[in-house]
Amino acid sequence: DLIKGNSQRYQTFFTKGCKCVKCGIEGKYFAKEKDLRAKSYHLNLYAVDDDGNEILMTKDHIIPRSKGGIDDISNYQPMCELCNKAKGNTIEN
């Protein structure tokens, strides 16, 4: 199965790196995965914490869409899932 390599997430990791801007954990490997409802596979980037737990790396909106942020590479940053959930729809300095 082919995987499209032009997603916003992949572009974010390629241009801005694979390290969470908040906690500094770094994505180490991609896993080919498929959501139960999806028709095609995608790659998820994972970091591994000191206890060996996998942590999904995400594309965060610096200015959340709910606050007027745009869907553009200039408004994206790499962030681990835990930090992204904690940030929610806030704007950090």
Can you describe what each PLM-predicted range is?
Residues D1-L45:
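Short, charged surface segments at domain edges that flank catalytic/cofactor-binding sites
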Residues K28, D72, Y76-N93:
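Short Cys/His-centered divalent metal-binding micro-motifs
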Residues G27-Y76:
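Histidine-centered nuclease catalytic patch
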Residues T12-T15, T58, T90:
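Residue-identity detector for threonine
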Residues D1, G68, E92-N93:
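Generic structural signal for short, solvent-exposed loop/turn connectors between secondary structure elements
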